[in-house]
């Protein structure tokens, strides 16, 4: 019922700034990213207990991920939109103005996670499996930053859940259109459902209802997120392009292939990774998950 009510709303951004105190300002985008990181640490710490990973290590990992993911997300975006920054290189650092790419964040975060895992001598797949639910949750939260910045929206629409875009934020091709697909909302809901699915799979594995192996949740994330992104990206008006191809869709297709091949490798070829999920311990609180 709540989702139905939400979809009946017309969305209008109040602006990118939450509050201004003299020369200082707090922007919605930064607040949402910070909230996503904190909630992600909490969730992954709970999951880590069942993967024989020190929960305290998750906070350390989060620092590595932020250092790796956010600059990579920005540089990925700038690389494909260089014409916007060539004459204003200082604007590259103005990340609070928007303009980051999740695929860049995933690449940078993955590199940071691999380095962290090697330094801590922790199996990589154990770490990725406890991180991906938090990643999906963080994406669900972070997409609302696009709403406040009036960016990353879709094509014009008259649907009840349409999004109003100020004239100075509209593409020239749609300058006369006022309302657009709220693709931020589509992806936010998709990622939230993906997060819930991953947590459900984790719980089923703990209860030995599913033969969950290390790496499976990572593969499911790659497939699930990418399927949604291919659909949603087709609606957007500001896609990063390589010629006539949408880069996010191409990367998503590659990610799906990796996810499917990973599942085949784990289960189909009988070369599975170790089953590192501990079964639920009698008397242990299930609320930990």
Curated annotation (Swiss-Prot):
This is Phosphatidylglycerol--prolipoprotein diacylglyceryl transferase. Catalyzes the transfer of the diacylglyceryl group from phosphatidylglycerol to the sulfhydryl group of the N-terminal cysteine of a prolipoprotein, the first step in the formation of mature lipoproteins. The chain crosses the membrane at residues 21-41, 53-73, 95-115, 122-142, 182-202, 215-235, 247-267. It comes from the Bacteria. Pathway: Protein modification; lipoprotein biosynthesis (diacylglyceryl transfer). Its EC number is 2.5.1.145. Disulfide bonds: none annotated. It is an enzyme of class 2 (transferase). Belongs to the Lgt family. It is a multi-pass membrane protein. PANTHER family: PHOSPHATIDYLGLYCEROL--PROLIPOPROTEIN DIACYLGLYCERYL TRANSFERASE, PROLIPOPROTEIN DIACYLGLYCERYL TRANSFERASE.
